[in-house]
Amino acid sequence: MEKRGESLDLGVRCKRGEERDRRPCWKPSRPGAARGGRGLWTVGGGGSPTETAESQQLGKPPEFWVSAHPGWLQVSCAHRASRWDASRWHPLQRFFARRGVRRPNPSVPSPLPKPPVPSAGSCEPLAPPPTSASGASRSWVTQTLAEAGAYRGCRPAPGSAAGWPRSDRRARLPRKASKPCSPALPSLAACCPQGFLRSGTKRVMCKVLGPGAGVRGTAVECSEQAGVWAHCRPQLTATFS
């Protein structure tokens, strides 16, 4: 693949992201070509047309085709980001460089963690807090103790509304403390004391009261902040773990 007596200025089409590069080249392809002979377009000023064709088959970019005739201009497509090194050229290098840095697609929503949806009967909506800075006024909120003076969102523990899975050892929670529903606040069954919250988040299992009622109930979590109530429906009791 050799070009005799024609300028590369004809028919050069640069792709998007590339620019035309005009540089004078003074490398003759063989002895005698610089003295008015018909020069060959070679790669890096090489020797024979065979070498030129082989080099072009290896994927050499056209910007390394140099003019053998002094005074001709090398017109090629050079990428704006970098200049290619013929010694380190790889056939796929231009492909990856043309792609550039991948940017996130704004049309595709990012997989953000969704807020946990409470099970049926695990939380009941209360009066919205005076300041809804966190945006939790429309969701499930829990009323704190009087000395806490803050509102906290109620989160269900892992598991369905029927309670913990049977395969989980946490299904049988130790009954360290049990409190019935307060008559003043029937929707608030029990409070997570500071003693349980110091070691981390603790779980509260709300269980149905009455004769013949099963031990399966709705599991909710107490917040790590002290003085947060756990939601239970009326006629339920809470068992701390």
Swiss-Prot record:
Sequence ranges of Gly residues compositional bias: 34-48
Compositional bias ranges of the Pro residues kind: 106-118
Region annotation Disordered: where it falls in the sequence: 19-59, 101-139, 152-182
Compositional bias annotation for Polar residues: 49-58
Protein name: Putative uncharacterized protein KIRREL3-AS3
Lineage of source species: Eukaryota, Metazoa, Chordata, Craniata, Vertebrata
